[in-house]
Amino acid sequence: MDGSSRPLPQTAQRKRRRPVLACDRCRRRKIRCDRKVPCSHCLRTGYASTCTYLANSNSSFPEEDLPGLDTTDPAMDMATSHPNHGHDRVPTDSGIGHSPPAQVEPIPSEGEMYGDFWDPLFVIHNTISTRKHRDPASTPASLGHVPRHTPAQAPTEVQVLIQRVRQLEQKVFSQQEPESSLAAPHIQQRHPQARRTVCQANLLGKSHWLVGFAQFDTIVHTLNNRLQDNDVEFRALFVKCQRLSRAIQQQYSLRASSLQALDGSLPSQEACDVCVNAYCRTFESVLRILHVPTFRQVYNEMWTGSQPTSRLFLLKLQLVIAIGARVVNQSDMLGTPDMASRCVAWIQEAQQWLHAPGESLQASVDGIQLYCLVLLTRIVCAVDASLVYVSTGALLQKAQQLGLHRDPSHFPAMPVFQAEIRRRLWCTVCELVLQSSTDSGTPPLISCDEFDCRPPANLNDTNLGTTSEPEPSNILTQTSFSILLMRCLPVRVQVAKVLNSVQLDPSYSEVLRLGEELTAACHYNTQMIKSMSPDHEQPTLFQLELLNLLTYRFLLCLHQPFAMKARKNLAYYFSRRVCLETAIQILAGHPTTPSGQNVNDYLNVKRYSSGLFRDPYLLASVTVGHEILCVTEGDWFSCQPVSPLTNNLSSTPNKSQQVPRTVLEEYVGLSECRLKDGAQIDIKTYVLLSCIIAQIKAAETGSPQDDAVLSAAVDSLEKCHIVLVDRYKSLAQSRESPQPLQVYGGSNVPCRLGKGSNDILDINETGEGEAWSDFDVSQVCVMCHSRYDLTSDCIQAEWSLQVEYPDLDWNLLNTWSACVPGSDSGAS
């Protein structure tokens, strides 16, 4: 340990081994690598997500030759000892013996990455996030550059000691690894960072739609680079759209506060009748909450004045009207041109009643019904839809407190009417909990082992109190779709747990098994619907579309992780094919439209709602867009939909090739409509979908994809700016023309709102000034579990969603989301 180098014998000398500087893929193909992360070759050939470097390339000599090795200077040695550059983490404290073995974080090789479920996401994310937050003084000029060893440099005692400590930690880690594997052989344990993606305030699981968008690294790199390069035009458009959306949000917030003071106000009776009928024929026919005959009886008594109306019923009626008005898309029925403001006021009023102290009816079946209506209204009217998962936890606990999770057969004295109402309500509670957990990418709060409540009987509401004999399964009733959903609930819950679990990591055979069970359940539902007797009532288009959405979305989420790896591994080709076919099935909808029905009911919901009615379609659009791009760029195989899932969509080969492109362009047009008059101002998704279309067109013509993506982003932002200006002007004009609101007693109540204090239309055209600080990407850091802490430089209030994905810098996407007050701004 005197620091002098020990000369090696002549017989023990070996050839000088040059350090490995190229990435793994370029080194195997023996081509020149520019040593970037990712390198230009991997980025050009579509392997950016798997561009990795050999971490321990400079320590390949035997242990006995360690004192004679040439090393770098101490600063560079400490830089390369980072977990992203070496196999082990170097302890920073003096207590070397107290360094826990868990700090040793080996970087998996490419083979290990493909063999694991989400290791590619973990490796690239870990590499980029660590290099981003590393001290600039210890960062090489090039990210992929590893300094060469020079003969003039000699190892110091500290360097030799550090190397010895590394070897000891490796030995301790290798000795403890078999013990942990024997303790839990059925659970594949891994780094927690590999199981989830962390943002500033949100933890997204594998069922979130942003996971699929991680494949479009070209789009995100191009837009991020343009923002960071101070592109005046692009940044100015970005600022104007952002500030306009905030101004619209303030106007909606002002209106909601004013309308909330109008207690008991309702639209006209004619408008209420249309909205109530729309709700009963759509959502109430699939997600059973109310007993329709009883509800209509009290509703008619309210207008005639024969019986006093309770506050609880009025709250239910307001939410039913809000949902029905969204279905029929007639906002003028609610007495205001801005339906979102009135829906927000009604939702806030119902939530205040649910959380008010001293309300004994909260812990009752009526209270559970109101709670379900509140959550459904938030989803349909895009009011805090991304936070519904948090509220479903309280709903589930209230339902369990009432014993809805236990089958009514355990209570012999309970009437048949009450027993069936409880079964229907429990089915709806389970569905809301499961769907909201999938939207947010979090583990489901329910387990099939924790309840024994059976599905409801196949009875109509009119026969519920007169007979207990259910109808045959081929007779459509008001509970037929609830029975179908409850039948496939166990496999869907299992899929949701597999996707968003922290500890369990399923094998591909397990995914195939779950996919087979889920596909069989979907096919069973299809066969049951086809077997409905033609002499009785037939299912509506809304019922068919909603049933497909609630079931097929789990099949898409289940195969999505392996479909992303199918481009490099043929073993996952089946997942890629299933994802494409399921995505087309979700986007295209039911191939035939039943005659004599309201065909626009579901289209209006899909156009204006959020959460459940937006996220699955975004994931399906991203899946279809990536498949089209792969085929256009000359991928090694083409994945055409030919299975029974889409056989109704493609009768000829030429038509089959056009179906993915058609459904993708249709949804891009639908997202543009959401900007114009939707409750949620969703700028981010519209810009990203437009960039996907532009990248596909550029790949078809052979033009540069970066230029096409940037041009599409600018054009889409300009269109967003025009739309938002029109919306703001219409809001300003409507403030001067109050709309009459009718109380159920018959009086008119005028509503007039004052002007706001800020005129956002006078925005600086150059985007300079205070707006530049709104999206300073240099001040945002990443929180990845406990490894990084949010510093005071982070602007959490301005960044509604901070997402870090493998090999991507999502700082650009964080502010591309603006909603009306209470609408989702975190799941975009």
From Swiss-Prot:
CC annotations in GO: nucleus
Biological process per Gene Ontology, one example term: DNA-templated transcription
Top-level taxonomic group: Eukaryota
SMART domains: Fungal_trans (SM00906), GAL4 (SM00066)
Phenotype of null mutants: Results in significantly reduced expression of the leporins biosynthesis gene cluster.
GO terms assigned for molecular function: DNA-binding transcription activator activity, RNA polymerase II-specific; RNA polymerase II cis-regulatory region sequence-specific DNA binding; zinc ion binding
One Pfam match: Zn_clus
UniProt region (Disordered), positions on chain: 1-20
Keywords assigned by UniProt, alphabetized: DNA-binding, Metal-binding, Nucleus, Transcription, Transcription regulation, Zinc
Subcellular location: Nucleus
Chief subcellular location: nucleus
DNA-binding region: 23-51
PROSITE patterns from the UniProt entry: ZN2_CY6_FUNGAL_1, ZN2_CY6_FUNGAL_2
Function: Transcription factor involved in regulation of gene cluster 23 that mediates the biosynthesis of leporins.
Protein name from the UniProt record: Transcription factor lepE
Organism: Aspergillus flavus (strain ATCC 200026 / FGSC A1120 / IAM 13836 / NRRL 3357 / JCM 12722 / SRRC 167)
Gene behind the chain: lepB
